[in-house]
Amino acid sequence: VADGVSYAFQGKIFAAGRLWLEPPLVPDAFKSQNVLLNGTRWCSLYPPGFPLLLAAGWFVGAPFLVNPVLLGLAIFGVFRLGTVLYDQATGVLGALLLAVSPFALLMGADFMPHVASLCIFTWCLAFLAESCKGIGARPLLVSGFLGAFGVVVRPQAAVLFLLPALIAALVARRKEIVRSIGFLGLGGAAPLAFLFAYNFALSGHPLRMGYVVNDPSLSFSFTSFAFGFSPSRLFWAHFPWFLHDLDATVWGFPWGDLLPLVFLLIPAPGRRRDAWLAACVLALVIGFSFFRFYDISHSGPRYAFEALGALALLAARAFRMAGRLAASLLERVRLGRYRTAGAAAAVVFLALFPLGTLLPEQAEALSHAYHAHTPEPLRRLKAAGVGPSALVLVAGNTVEWTYGSFLLENGTDPRRAPRVFARDLPEKRAELLAAYPRKEVWRVDVTLRPLPHPNLWIDNTWDVEGIVWSRLR
């Protein structure tokens, strides 16, 4: 999607050792959604945390591996968090549930920052939980660093999700609260200093992010968060949507994904820790219920994605409680010998059902031109005969969105790149030809047709109707 293209673009810029690029010649021909392009700067408008991680992928020529690696680390983080809070069995089941979530797997296949923040937030919770056991200063330093870096990745989500956990951890350490705050602040100093320095370089103010540079009418006040809409109206529209969509898209179980959480209402040891995780989940969902936008991205409500680690552990706790009740029932009817087999069958079902039902359905829907982005024209570039020195003019009925599929193919300085991909602007074609003289000039016309919603949780998909490569010179 356009957001992912913007993040990947900034990662490429960081990998080149730059904070931003010089504006290209004929800048209107390089405009892409969610990319800041003004008289002095060409860069992403998003926070710099995730592009820093993507830069490592660009260094090794594989930026597409960054999110899968981060998802793997997030899964291990759920195991670690579950082990610290409860026991190893809960950690294993929680990690398994996250690993088989179609929502998590499909989000992990793109350049969106939510997987990074899921990973960072989950590990931050793990070290905060460890710090409550009084094990030295290291957990506080690490959780401070991770929490602050989470702000550099997704500021609003980090504050909403981590604030309840931070408050609870400080209450648990209230006898040495000053020391705890000091270590947390020391750990978080470097990421926050980087964010403030980056913002200052980009906008002239440490708290003014690229969003505001791109659109000066924005701010990070509550009113701006709601974009002028009634907060109560937004909440009562969005909060039920979050609950409905989370119930249907995290795993796609036939009984619903949130219903098993009712087992957590049964009194049992560890319920305070359950409440700690639930507070983080609810704070994130409630907070973004006041946001102007509500969208489904990669098969689920993306503004709640960072809660999946905590939600997986809560589901694991609920399933284990249900398992204990089922085992007790088997004992009462003298079928206790089937306890182990029943537990194994239940785990296999929990693991395989999402992978065999919801995942193929959602993956097929996403295999179309999602948000009007498609790699198909570039796949046909070689067969069309496009040479190494070429100016490629991109046209089509959705070029405003589709051009993002070509943006990353440009060099960091299009003037010196062998191939240049620009939007075909007829009124500026002569200017483009003069600015980027290449041996060949090509035009690619991409025609897309919007599809009806294939299901309740995938939208903005298109079919490729035609791709025409034509050599102009």
Regions found by a protein language model. Give the residues of each.
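Membrane-interface transmembrane helices that cradle and orient dolichyl/undecaprenyl
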Residues: 53, 83-89, 124-140, 150
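Transmembrane-helix motifs of polytopic, lipid-linked glycan transferases
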Residues: 63-86, 123-127
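Hydrophobic, aromatic-rich transmembrane alpha-helices
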Residues: 73-75, 166-169, 240-278, 282-285
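Short helix- or helix-capping micro-motifs
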Residues: 91-102, 126, 147-151, 165
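Transmembrane alpha-helix segments characteristic
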Residues: 98, 147, 164, 183-191, ...
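Short acidic/glycine- and proline-prone juxtamembrane loop motifs at membrane-interface regions
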Residues: 103-116
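Perimembrane helix-loop-helix junctions
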Residues: 127-139, 159-192, 196-197
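Signature aromatic-anchored transmembrane alpha helix within multi-pass, membrane-resident enzymes
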Residues: 166, 185-189, 193, 282, ...
